[in-house]
């Protein structure tokens, strides 16, 4: 199994901008999609972690060993009922976004569902497709998500989708070198809609 983290993030042809209708398609991920999806996550964590996560830790948490571990974990999560969605660029059939939600195992979870990952390659941002990916992943479910406390783009995105910043003090992720995290929560959503 190829666990490399090389994902081509070169710019797209000028004749097909990211906002072109029908350029991206959301679909259920299968086990075979997980290596490429994990590589997308590694590229995105590398980007958002610059200047936030210490360089040595960032190299470690986005390297091939962690990508391989992520693939193994995600296979188990998928087998246990986690919802995995990917966004595929129809130009070259590459995975450019990944989202995963699962029933939380945390004893202090404010909602049953947790968005465990939602990552988007830079060339596939700001075209509305992330909205479709989030909707396909959690629909109208109440859910929560942890983001880097200083990631204003992520916080704004989730707030547009009815999430609010949790009043708690947040958390610190020691596995990422002490990065401060903020939890956002969307609750009181009518599940049957």
Language-model regions: role of each:
Residues 2-19, 179-193:
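Terminal substrate-recognition subdomain of acyl/acetyltransferases
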Residues 6, 12-13, 24, 28-34, ...:
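Acetyl-CoA-dependent GNAT
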Residues 40-44, 140, 157, 161:
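Alpha-helical interaction/dimerization surfaces of two-component signaling modules
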Residues 131-132, 150-178:
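Conserved active-site alpha-helix within GNAT-family acetyltransferase domains
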Residues 139-150:
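Conserved GNAT acetyl-CoA-binding A-motif
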């Amino acid at each position: 199994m190829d666990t490399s983290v090389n994902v081509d993030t070169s710019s797209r042809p000028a004749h097909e901008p990211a906002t072109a209708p029908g350029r991206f398609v959301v679909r259920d991920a299968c086990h075979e999609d997980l290596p490429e999806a994990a590589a997308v996550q590694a590229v995105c964590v590398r980007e958002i972690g610059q200047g936030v996560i210490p360089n040595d830790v960032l190299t470690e948490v986005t390297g091939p060993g962690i990508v391989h571990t992520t693939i193994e974990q995600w296979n188990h999560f998928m087998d246990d009922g986690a919802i995995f969605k990917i966004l595929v660029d129809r130009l070259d059939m590459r995975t450019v976004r990944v989202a995963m939600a699962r029933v939380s195992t945390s004893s202090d979870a404010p909602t049953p569902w947790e968005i465990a990952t939602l990552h988007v390659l830079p060339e596939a941002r700001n075209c509305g497709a992330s909205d479709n990916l989030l909707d396909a992943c959690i629909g109208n479910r109440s859910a929560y998500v942890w983001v880097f406390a200083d990631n204003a783009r992520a916080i704004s995105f989730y707030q547009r989708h009815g999430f609010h910043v949790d009043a708690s003090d947040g958390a610190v992720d020691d596995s990422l070198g002490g990065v401060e995290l903020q939890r956002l929560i969307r609750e009181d959503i009518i599940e049957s809609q």
